[in-house]
Amino acid sequence: MSKKLVTEEMRTQWLPVLEKKSEQIQPLTAENVSVRLLQNQAEWNAKNLGESEGPSSVNANVGKWQPVLIDMAKRLAPNNIAMDFFGVQPLAGPDGQIFALRARQGVGDASNTQQSRKELFMEEAQTNYSGDQTTVHSGDPSGFSQADIEGSGTEVSSYGKAMDTVKAEQLGSPTQPWARVGITIQKATVTAKSRGLYADYSHELRQDMMAIHGEDVDAILSDVMVTEIQAEMNREFIRTMNFTAVRFKKFGTNGVVDVAADVSGRWALEKWKYLVFMLEVEANGVGVDTRRGKANRVLCSPNVASALAMAGMLDYSPALNVQAQLAVDPTGQTFAGVLSNGMRVYIDPYAVAEYITLAYKGATALDAGIYFAPYVPLEMYRTQGETTFAPRMAFKTRYGIAANPFVQIPANQDPQVYVTEDGIAKDTNVYFRKGLIKNLY
């Protein structure tokens, strides 16, 4: 009697495993990021503000800054464009570490170091490495010959195969060594840096503002300083993205796309719609370069967003599935809408040049091209002038910023040595891709 391929005993044993849902690894969500920031803020408040609770009702009507700062910190985080484009990793101290774990062929020996070995998973898998190494792996990754692709040429594609039983039985012998793999864990540091603003005012201004306008100068100046710090941070992050992004590779010349020459279409509307195909191709290129995923964020000038909206490609109300006109407001929020291919579109409200920058951000806070590492959202200082006794106040914030470790840390970096630079260099970060748009209209 022939042996049954699948028995009832096998089904009883393995069906519960097959039917059980895999437990998902919970990522660091935006909510958790805010929780960590508020905790940092509360710890700073307790250590530095010196506000005591006071006995019973003695201080019942004494104003306190702790709840005010908590509210400001809560408002600050969601308005930060880094929350949409960067990975966010709150710091628990003034310095932090980030790591790049790279899988590699082989291990270090007397003739080479482990970090010099070829990295796995970033390129096509070498088909003969774990199999028969006497077979050749070369040519086009998909197996096409040069004649297939170009119409002429003699180069053919060859690929590795699995080893036969005789060679497999000899694995580990001097003539048939195992193909080996290993890992390197390379490390870099990120340090919190600061921004700060200061303001002072007279007692007379405080009294008159309250008497005539019913306004609290403390609250007004606090709001001004926090808003200015937030605006400067957003501009830093936008400029950082555009500075470090690589240029478009498939369209245009050296990252400059001329709509009149490089984009297909009979009139403006068709060309604006073709822009979406262009974005899709370049977004796929981000996925190829990073091996993480295709670009899913767009940062562009207001006029580019308006062109996409006029072409009917932006859905401002995706929950209702309604194609609505998009009113791009350069003075309003940076979020503009959702492209028909699912990409979220944000505008650079101060852009003069017409441009598009694509970015990839994954489902977790570790999966992005740049890391934003906030430490203390807001530090507040209050004092009085030494001769005028006029009120003075200042705000500071502390945060770090660094490129993804796979961008920041060179592939051949010695694992025993820390990288102390932030990895923000011109045209180097493959998680972002930029293009200037000429002759948009």
UniProtKB/Swiss-Prot annotation:
Q: Which GO terms describe its cellular component?
A: viral capsid
Show the propeptide residue ranges. Answer: 1-51
Query: InterPro entries from the entry?
Result: Gp23/Gp24_T4-like
Q: Which domain of life is it from?
A: Viruses
Q: Where in the cell is it found?
A: Virion
Q: Is the Magnesium keyword given for this protein?
A: no
Q: Which residues form the signal peptide?
A: none
Question: Would you tell me the protein name for this molecule?
Answer: Major capsid protein
Q: Which organism is it from?
A: Serratia phage KSP90
